[in-house]
Amino acid sequence: MAKSIPRISSRRNGPIGSGKTVRRIPKGVIHVQASFHNTIVAVTDVRGRVVSWSSAGTSGFKGTRRGTPFAAQTAATKAIRTVVDQGMLRAEVLIKGPGLGRDAALRAIRRSGILLTFVRDVTPMPHNGCRPPKKRRV
């Protein structure tokens, strides 16, 4: 008599759903990185694990439109919408970079209904470190 072949569970036969567990996150940190060409918004929990993120490029803006304040506002709204559904009530905001989207992203975060404990500018500033690139001659 032939041996029966053991069944190997496939991806289709596995558990239904994405497998992610929805965690309640009452407090978090919102990181806004605003460069001249793009704005990236990442929402993390207090330990630094990324819960949600978005950028002007993933929000549907391409080319030079990614650096606009409206694109930054859209990216911030998109990143925060998911964490508000997960129950985030309070957040700290860390803003980095010289881009146009700094203020627009902060305005969108304020409008979301999350209580902001503090807003800090963490743009790296050299204490006369590396020599900057030469000036352009146009």
Swiss-Prot record:
Q: What is its main location?
A: plastid
Q: Which family does it belong to?
A: Belongs to the universal ribosomal protein uS11 family.
The compartments listed are:
Plastid
State the superkingdom: Eukaryota
The identity of this protein, by name, is: Small ribosomal subunit protein uS11c
Indicate the quaternary assembly.
Part of the 30S ribosomal subunit.
The yes or no answer to whether the keyword Transmembrane is present is no
Q: Where is this region: Disordered?
A: 1-22
Gene3D superfamilies (alphabetical): Ribosomal protein S11 (3.30.420.80)
Ribosomal protein keyword on record: yes
Annotated Gene Ontology MF terms? rRNA binding; structural constituent of ribosome
* Lineage of source species: Eukaryota, Viridiplantae, Streptophyta, Embryophyta, Tracheophyta
Q: Which UniProt keywords apply?
A: Plastid, Ribonucleoprotein, Ribosomal protein, RNA-binding, rRNA-binding
- Give the GO biological process terms: translation
The terms describing its cellular component in GO are: plastid; ribonucleoprotein complex; ribosome
